[in-house]
Structures are given as structure tokens and as C-alpha cells.
Regions:
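Charged, low-complexity, helix-prone segments enriched in Lys/Glu/Asp/Gln
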Residues: 17, 118, 125-129, 194-199
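Conserved glycine(s) of the Walker
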Residues: 72
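Secondary-structure transition/capping residues
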Residues: 18-22, 87-90, 166, 185-186, ...
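PAPS-dependent sulfation machinery
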Residues: 48, 54-57, 61, 66-69, ...
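PAPS-dependent sulfotransferase catalytic domain
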Residues: 94, 101-106, 135-243, 252-265
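PAPS-dependent sulfotransferases, especially Golgi type II membrane carbohydrate sulfotransferases
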Residues: 1-63, 179, 203-207, 233-297
Length: 297
């Protein structure tokens, strides 16, 4: 008689229970993990163009650098920030500051003041920039967030007296730098496509805004004093030699993760740009932009 039978006889006599082998469990149906849904893009709010800037805005004649990623905007803002009248902080990303209503009553109250959600956002943007400028003690603020180019109309409408600086660079150099900044995140081909979105946005802004000033990265690094003198003339300020030695100040102007903070920027002086690619080295996807910006004949 087996051990199991003896155990069951004794167990049954004392408890009335028996031990049985559990049946093999059949595998259940395979269920797929639920797909992550990308949240719907929030529609751009309506707003009115101010007809009374003296009342609606605290900021006067702000400066916006419209540039693609990796086009030298951090270098340019460091040079401008060394001017005693120009305050050029790190990227502020004001377009991502949004306003919403906590209740129907708050919406109705703002409607009664003729303030839509877009108008309230403009008031917020203006206050943030004005606060930063006031803290600096300077006269004009310079904002250089690359994604501003995607909403250039809102920025133009928010500050009717704004000045715009368009910073251009060879599209291939932009794509190479964008890829090298994080090669594990994006291939060179992906960097070309992604950077091209910013280039197109800047190109649209350049066509849609009158009276701006264009600076080319290659010319800025080759002859910084000449290009800065021309830019200062456009901005209505005197050229200051200290702009060429922006590194003489402390290092608080560089914030890791906000703009370019690599050694080339931290050197404190303008460094030579990378050699330009030959025409046959330009990827097909970038050739139209190279031609539009005068880098390909």
C-alpha cells in the first residue's frame, strides 16, 4: 500500500479530509497590455490683439530670437546678456504657460472683463517676462526659446512693439549638432527630420514678420564684433566691447538642461564654427532649406 494511501486513510479517520493531486492548470488566454493613448492636443485659444498696449502690457519692446535648435542661439544670448542694457536669460518656454478656468463662474467673470483664455495667457507671459527684466535691472529682455517660432503670430500679436532677430545656420550643421547632442535618442536621419521642423517654422516667421534682423551663425563666429555692431544698431543700443568676452562674468548664466551648456559655450569667448559640408554631402531632405537660406547655389 502506498504512502499516499496510508496518509489518506489516517487523515480521513481523524479529519474526514483526503489529499488529492491538483490538476494541471491550463494556460489562460493571452491579453495584450492596453495601448497608451496620446492625450489630444489642446486647441490654441482665441485672443484679441491689444489696441491699448500701455494698459495691457508691462513689457516694452522685448526682443525675440527666432532660431532652430542647435543654431547658436545660446551663444548669441550669452553675447547679448553681456550688454549692460540687455537681459537675455535662459530659455523661458513661456508659450507652454497656460491658463484655465477653475469654474464656470470664473469664465463668466473674465468674459465680463472682455478677457478670453488667450488674453489671460498673454497677461501671464507679459508679467513673467516683466518680472524677470525688473529683477535684472536692465532695459530690455531677450527671449530665445527655439519653439517660439511655432507661435510667432501670437508673440507678434501679444507685443506689437516686439523686435525679432532671425538666427540662421547651415541646415546640415544644425542636424549634425542635434544628432550629436543625444545620439542614443535620435539617429542622424531622425535629427535631420526633427530639426527641419524648426527650420521651417523659423522660415515661416521670417516671411511673416516685417522689420526683423537676420544673423548668420557662420558670420557671427567669423567676425563677432562686426555682426554684433550691426545687431546693436538694429536694437537701438550702443555696441559694448564687453559683449565679446561674456565669460568674464560668473557662470550663473548657464543652466544645465536649458539651452546649450557644453564646454564650447562655457569657454566664455566666441569659438570657430565647424567646417561647412560640401554640396554633395547635403541630405536630400535638407537641400530645399539649404537653397532657401542661401547655403546651396
Amino acid at each position: 500500500m502506498s504512502l499516499m494511501r496510508n496518509m489518506n486513510r489516517a487523515l480521513t479517520a481523524t479529519t474526514g479530509l483526503q489529499v488529492r493531486r491538483a490538476p494541471k492548470r491550463q494556460p489562460g488566454p493571452v491579453t495584450k497590455a492596453p495601448e497608451k493613448k496620446t492625450p489630444a492636443k489642446r486647441p490654441a485659444p482665441e485672443y484679441r490683439c491689444t489696441d491699448d498696449p500701455a494698459t495691457d502690457r508691462l513689457l516694452r519692446r522685448p526682443v525675440f530670437i527666432m532660431s532652430p535648435v542647435r543654431s547658436g542661439s545660446t551663444l548669441l544670448r550669452m553675447l547679448l546678456d553681456a550688454h549692460p542694457r540687455l537681459h537675455a536669460p535662459h530659455e523661458l518656454h513661456i508659450r507652454r504657460l497656460e491658463v484655465d478656468y477653475g469654474s464656470t463662474l470664473s469664465r463668466r467673470a473674465m468674459d465680463a472683463l472682455d478677457l478670453s483664455r488667450g488674453d489671460l495667457e498673454h497677461l501671464l507671459w507679459d508679467r513673467v517676462l516683466h518680472r524677470e527684466l525688473t529683477r535684472s535691472g536692465k532695459d530690455f529682455i531677450v527671449e530665445k526659446t527655439p519653439s517660439n517660432a511655432f507661435v510667432y503670430r501670437r508673440i507678434r500679436d501679444c507685443w506689437p512693439d516686439a523686435r525679432f532677430v532671425f538666427l540662421l545656420r547651415h541646415p546640415v550643421s544644425i542636424a549634425q549638432s542635434w544628432h550629436e547632442g543625444d545620439p542614443d535618442k535620435r539617429t542622424y536621419e531622425e535629427a535631420c527630420a526633427d530639426a527641419l521642423r524648426y527650420m521651417k517654422a523659423v522660415d515661416n516667421a521670417r516671411k511673416g514678420i516685417t522689420g526683423g534682423h537676420t544673423v548668420r551663425y557662420e558670420e557671427l563666429t567669423a567676425d563677432p564684433e562686426r555682426r554684433l555692431r550691426a545687431l546693436c544698431t538694429y536694437l537701438g543700443v550702443d555696441f559694448e566691447p564687453a559683449m565679446l568676452d561674456y565669460g568674464a562674468r560668473d557662470g550663473t548664466q548657464v543652466q544645465k538642461g536649458l539651452g546649450d551648456w557644453r564646454d564650447k559655450i562655457r569657454s566664455g569667448t566666441v569659438q570657430a564654427g565647424r567646417p561647412l559640408p560640401k554640396d554633395d554631402e547635403i541630405p536630400e531632405v535638407l537641400r530645399p532649406m539649404c537653397e532657401a537660406w542661401g547655403y546651396l547655389k
